[in-house]
């Protein structure tokens, strides 16, 4: 990712950075309109996800997470920006005339070829089942399926990468980007390599307006609110929170409370919890 720095003419351009190489010019048959509603509210209109709302209108890009074009070579034609995710996407022209978007693998260049199937070489961008004999232990993978045929659901964010640790019986052991170690069926497929745009965390928006374009609203501390709005609110002047430990706006512990659903079906598949 090539970071472009502006001349220091104003405070916003002095601190802001943009990617100067990746543009957005999507194909009309691979996009569709998306009705964004809720602004972080549920069906009752109550805020369930804070600091969301506004933002620029977006067109959703149809991403091929299933990689159903088997044993047909495709060529990377463009590398484009996607407003719906941090990762870049690339347009693939397949040999049978099909055109699809996939997640951009790190290091992939325009003109490179990719293919998906059961017996394909271990090459960046190729998709194959975890049971393939050509996929050795220690392979870096992304866009991993949880359910066969449903499409990749794990390790899809910018810079995300998982590692194949072991194969035993009908399952494969993976180490996910969060540090979690879990079992997945060997029949599920994955894409070789790491997701591109690794340096997205190093990018500086430079000003508050750029944050609002992304649909992110300001974050307000609970201690400066009124008691009706937050358990930390109220008091004369700069008062302490008045509790032993910080809490959420709904009174639950804010630091270190487990939010995973109890007795979930996949508990038996997780060998080690994610690292904090």
UniProtKB/Swiss-Prot annotation:
Example GO molecular function: structural constituent of ribosome
Entry keyword annotation includes Thylakoid: no
Keyword Ribonucleoprotein in annotation: yes
GO CC, any one term: mitochondrial large ribosomal subunit
Pfam (any one): Ribosomal_L2_C
Family membership noted in the UniProt record: Belongs to the universal ribosomal protein uL2 family.
Assembly behavior: Part of the 50S ribosomal subunit.
Stated name of the protein: Large ribosomal subunit protein uL2cy
Species assigned in the record: Coffea arabica (Arabian coffee)
Phylogenetic placement of the source organism: Eukaryota, Viridiplantae, Streptophyta, Embryophyta, Tracheophyta
């Amino acid at each position: 990712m090539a970071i472009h720095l502006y001349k220091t003419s104003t405070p916003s351009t002095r601190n802001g950075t943009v990617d100067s190489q990746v543009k957005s010019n999507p194909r009309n048959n691979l996009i569709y309109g998306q009705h964004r509603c809720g602004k972080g509210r549920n069906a009752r209109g109550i805020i369930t996800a804070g600091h969301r709302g506004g933002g620029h209108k977006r067109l959703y890009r149809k991403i091929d997470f299933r990689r159903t074009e088997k044993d047909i070579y495709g060529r990377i034609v463009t590398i484009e920006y996607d407003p719906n995710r941090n990762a870049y996407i690339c347009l693939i022209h397949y040999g049978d005339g099909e055109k699809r978007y996939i997640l951009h693998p790190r290091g992939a260049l325009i003109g490179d070829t990719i293919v998906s199937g059961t017996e394909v070489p271990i090459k960046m961008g190729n998709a194959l089942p975890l049971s393939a004999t050509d996929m050795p232990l220690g392979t870096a993978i992304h866009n991993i399926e949880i359910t066969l045929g449903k499409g990749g659901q794990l390790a899809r964010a910018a810079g995300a990468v998982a590692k194949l640790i072991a194969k035993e019986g009908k399952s494969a052991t993976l180490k996910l980007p969060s540090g979690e170690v879990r079992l997945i069926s060997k029949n599920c497929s994955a894409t070789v390599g790491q997701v591109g745009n690794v340096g997205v965390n190093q990018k500086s928006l430079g000003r508050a307006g750029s944050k609002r374009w992304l649909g992110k609203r300001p974050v307000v501390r609970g201690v400066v609110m009124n008691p009706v709005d937050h358990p930390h609110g109220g008091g004369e002047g700069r008062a302490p929170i008045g509790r032993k430990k910080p809490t959420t706006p709904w009174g639950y512990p804010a630091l270190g409370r487990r939010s995973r659903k109890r007795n979930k079906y996949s508990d038996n598949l997780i060998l080690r919890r994610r690292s904090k």
